[in-house]
Amino acid sequence: MAGTLVNHIPWQLSGIGSGTLGQYNPTDLDYDYAIGGIPFVSGIKDENPYTERMAPIRKEQFDNFAEPGEQSLDGWWLRSQSTFTGGAGVLYQDPDNDNQFNYRFADSLGVDPWEAGNLTLLRRSIEVTSTTNPLPLVRGYVDPTGVDSYWRADGNNLVKHTQAGSTSIVAAGASIASLSSSGARYLFARSDGVFFGLDTAAPTQLTNSALTSPVVEAVKDRIIVTSANSVYQLTYASVGALPAAVYTHQDPSWRWRSITDGPTSIYIAGDSGTTSQIHKFAVVDEAGLPVLRWTGVTATMPAGEIIRTIYSYIGTFIGIATNKGFRVGEIDGNGDILYGPLLFEPTFGCTGIVGNDRFMWVGSQEAHDGDTGLFRVDLGNQTQEQTTRAVRYAYARDIYGEGEFSGGVTSVTMFGASDRKVFAVAFGGFYREQATELLPTGYLKTGRIRFNTEEPKLYKFFSVRMPNALDGSIAISGLTEGGGEIPYITYSGAASSGTKDVATSQPVGPQNWFALKFTLERDDSDSSLGPSLNGWQVKALPGSIRQRILTVPVLLFDNEKDRAYQSYGYEGFARERLEQFKALARAGDSLLFQEINDNLVTEVIIDDWEFRQDGPPAPAGSLGGILTMVLRTTAEST
């Protein structure tokens, strides 16, 4: 067939411009290559070589981030953290508009993240006494001699506790249903009335009326007590029957649950079993004279969410513990409550709130890896949810009773004027935070480190920063997307981590995400000493299968010869193929690149191309020269 001139194009172009890959079906002509169904003969010469190379995977970019940092570094993909004060709840340790990844983490237990740049163990809580009571209560105060103290109500018993010991106050009568205080004066309510007393003195009865589900609280220099669906105001001089109700809810099944106050109002939360609300009561009338007057409902919970405890703090914030979890509200200038979303949602909800410094603590049930304890909320640290952008406050799990899973926290208070907490657990016990003894162990888990992309990554190294000499130890392990935990290294004693990289030999191969877990253990000989973690860093590389760049020169003339020296073509043949090729390149879609003689087919996109005609046009004006295609593979396999 040598020397035969073929005057028609013997191929079919499949899918040009239709979004398909395009494939050339071989005919009698012996071509070398085809791209998108257009066949070509090789134009390889010394000056026009065929080349293959790896495609770059790191783009050159201008860094206009406000702060210098990891995004400015070349080579490694880096993620690091040097403070943990943003609290728990982050899913991905990835940058966003407010860069929460810099200071938040996924979860923790038994550790204190609230000092910037320093993660330590929390103090231990010990059981002072056990209880079989479903509603144990505690209330902290400073006694008349200046000693940090708290009252413990356990059934029909009322007991004063100090660090040195305890003193029984009441040991008979009906079970105490509600406990409050005003300074060193206690108040409690039970089914046969309301009682008060100073420190450890025997109680005096304020009212002898029978009470149903009573709640008592000393607020705004008043004694507020509820019974069934009614609200009453008492004074220390009003011994006897209950006075007329200040307010009675129209629903006879309504029950009041908790009382607190704000700068200008008293708030009482209650529910009918399905609907739960916070009612506002004014404490002065229009003339500025003292009064207690119902002014309306200031907050209504979503259907099915029942308030258990409300707690006002520093005249601005109001904690709302419900059967669904915990919310933080704010009191506006009119005394109305604006509450936010649920910060966290333990399985059994929350009960009991106390505030100190910039924090609130709220009780939970079996939310500390099966044990019962407290959550801490940082009122001075607002964050926004990564997905919904809802405003939230930083939080984390806090102190807990080790091995305590009998019931939920029913009450929490401060131990006098100290920074130590005391909490009561239904059917369990009364727990007091220790002054110096630390928990034996605790951990922190980072969010999922995925570098803001679903592309696979190769996680190669991590490093940690901690003091040169550790009191105790820190063990680091990796958490994988398959749910596994891989132990890496433990630092202890005088072993300093410095900034040395630790290789992560596992997990093997590309991963979508990776996380670290830091387990802190206190000193073996001194329970008041424990390790500190100051920061961490992870190094990774892109794990995508590398693309190839192919540079392929082909002939583009009106009349050509194939590999078998068979002539083919016609006038305008080069122009026609060039225009077809340019249409494919402009479309930018993936195409099939065929190396016909080797029977290889590769999916590619056209990255670039150049047509070069070294000589002047033929007499007929037709073009002819070398077309150099720069192709990038798109569907490589391992």
Language-model segments: what does each one mean?
Residues 294, 340, 410-413, 497-507:
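Exposed aromatic-hydrophobic patches
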Residues 540-638:
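Extracellular/virion structural assembly segments
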Residues 406-445:
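Blade-level signature of beta-propeller repeat domains, shared across WD40, Kelch, NHL, RCC1
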